[in-house]
Amino acid sequence: MSAEKRELEDSGSNGELKRQDVSFSKGIAHIKAEFIAKSNDNSQFQQAYNDEEIADADRIGAEGGKNSRKHKKKQRGQNKSRDNRQVKEEKVLCPKYIQGYSEDGESLCQFGDKCRFVHDIKEYLSHKKPEIELDQFKICPVFDALGFCPMGFKCRFMSSHFDKENFKLVKRGTDEERQKLWSLDHEVNRITSEEKLSLIKRRFPFTKSNEVLDIIDSIQQEFRDITAPKVSKEEASEDKPKDSNEAEVAPQVLQREEELKKKREHQRELYLKYKDTRYFAQEKKDLDLRRKKIVSPLTTVGNLPYRRLMRKLGADVTYSEMALAVPLIQGTNSEWALPKAHSTEIPGFGVQIACSKAWQAAKAAEALAKFTPDINEINLNSGCPIDLLYRQGSGSALLDNPARMIRCLNAMNYVSDSIPITVKIRTGTRDSHPVADTLVKRLVYETDVAAITLHGRSRQQRYTRVADWDYVSTVAKSLRESEASFLESAEGKESRESKRRIQFVGNGDVNNFEDWHRILNNDENIDSIMVARGALIKPWVFEEVDAQQHLDKSSTERLEILRDYAQFSMEHWGTDEYGIAQCRRFFCEFMSFFHRYIPIGICERYPVQLNERPPNWVGRDDLETLMGSTDARDWIKLSEMFFGKVEESFVFTPKHKSSSFPSA
């Protein structure tokens, strides 16, 4: 369905919409009187959303522990103890028989009768849950898109691609036609089983990583030797044993000392070779983010179907969910699922990683460069405020240790072949001590990063106050001055002959075209803006940026967006029972932000800022009211329009406690 665009005019006191007056409506989203709910329940207005860093504590690990203090149950923060277990099938069909029996009747499974899965397809179908019948999807959405369904007999829409008379699955069109459909709609950056096994079994050589880590170690060791307190010859002679009859030193000790001596000589050679060079400098592909429409990396909600939706709605650049370096190096399945991307995301797709040490950064970047070629940049997350990562030295903890951050970036730059390296930072870890302005100077002089993204908040601040765009502009100016100074230096003339401009991207609170264009038009030092929550609450924000007008999406238009998300979800996670459960869960996670959109047509003033909260309101129709509900049970009701009737055992607990609460 094509979106109907309605330009909203400025108005006076005649009851039409007015532009936002911050002094008049600070913290409050004003709704027209006729749309304010006639209810005594004021809980929605009082409830404050907690936009704690959108990150998956379920995957990273609970932040509590044996030593954590007992607290009263809070109404804000993450629901870390929520149950995300999925219901399993009573009878599970063997993967070898998903597409049916072999034509010659021979067994397809090497385990034969000893296999723990069902080989009798009719027996499996007799225990399979009923078909999903929907108005939104008359036939299997995956079959409709690709001409075949990879889920085969396990598909909950199987009747649309099943020949009952011959008891076999059907395909649509010729092989060439299906190949053409696949070329337009497929996923990239899939790591093979053999490649993953090489990581699990530690067979992958990490040649480049070992090289650069040796260089970094030699430089650090030389620095330690220089700064170590010097011992005089007299003191050294006093330390030696004076008794000639003392027992001789053990051979193992002598051997160890000899090995250390050789290692130190090797480190000395490396240091002399690379001390006056930018050893990390490599030829990279150009990275152009100028005026690009960028979606921020978003853990959990920033999954592949969501990114694909954002590409359809006008985004130019998308990022994977944050991947942890160590699980990547270890070949963990769940972590290697994160760099996957849809073909529509190429070019303009980046992978974000989090790490605490240079060896983690180097090996993760080398593995990504080797196994996932369809990426345009690798981004180091140096801004994540999650306590667990911070205590491990990852995320925003790197802001407190810029030397370590620089080593990580240089190691990544050395091993990533032609893939540019970028970094995302915050203003600092404490409100009273911003460090970004001094940090960018070091990044210019000591690294070859292609882009810097600055979130205009500190770690301490989280989302409690608005982003400081004045400071973002200050840092952008500092970056340009440092660039100019560096390029005039002898080192700069040698190392940056191409004089590539470091891309600078601002981030924080932008959710409308007015802020977007105002910031970029008023500050040439800022190349683009990264949008996070604004693109979750209002996915068509980039359509507004292009049109340079507010778009009042109707409930049917917003339902079409949800339908696209559901379609993309089923193509990604599948249409079997497990896939549908995954689709429903992530649909509800998406709704935990999408429901916060306040239709412009019911607003007294606009645009509504992210930190503004409305009183209870009703929409212009029942569907609009339903999509604006804060009750997770209503989100589940919406999911039934796309994924069928929900199981009685299905329970969805929003990640953020304040994202949803039952209505009275």
From Swiss-Prot:
Active-site residues per Swiss-Prot or TrEMBL entry: 384 (proton donor)
Disordered: region residues: 1-22, 47-87, 230-261
Gene3D superfamilies xrefs: Aldolase class I (3.20.20.70), Zinc finger, CCCH-type (4.10.1000.10)
GO cellular component: cytoplasm; nuclear periphery
Keyword Flavoprotein: yes
InterPro entries: Aldolase_TIM, DUS-like_FMN-bd, tRNA_hU_synthase_CS, Znf_CCCH
Catalytic activity: 5,6-dihydrouridine(47) in tRNA + NAD(+) = uridine(47) in tRNA + NADH + H(+); 5,6-dihydrouridine(47) in tRNA + NADP(+) = uridine(47) in tRNA + NADPH + H(+); a 5,6-dihydrouridine in mRNA + NAD(+) = a uridine in mRNA + NADH + H(+); a 5,6-dihydrouridine in mRNA + NADP(+) = a uridine in mRNA + NADPH + H(+)
Keywords attached to this entry: Cytoplasm, Flavoprotein, FMN, Metal-binding, mRNA processing, NAD, NADP, Nucleus, Oxidoreductase, Repeat, tRNA processing, Zinc, Zinc-finger
Keyword set includes Transit peptide: no
Basic and acidic residues compositional bias, start-end: 230-245
Zinc finger boundaries on the chain: C3H1-type: 88-122, 134-164
Primary site of residence: cytoplasm
GO molecular function, one term: mRNA dihydrouridine synthase activity
Similarity-based family: Belongs to the Dus family. Dus3 subfamily.
Name of this protein: tRNA-dihydrouridine(47) synthase [NAD(P)(+)]
Annotated organism of origin: Vanderwaltozyma polyspora (strain ATCC 22028 / DSM 70294 / BCRC 21397 / CBS 2163 / NBRC 10782 / NRRL Y-8283 / UCD 57-17)
Gene: DUS3
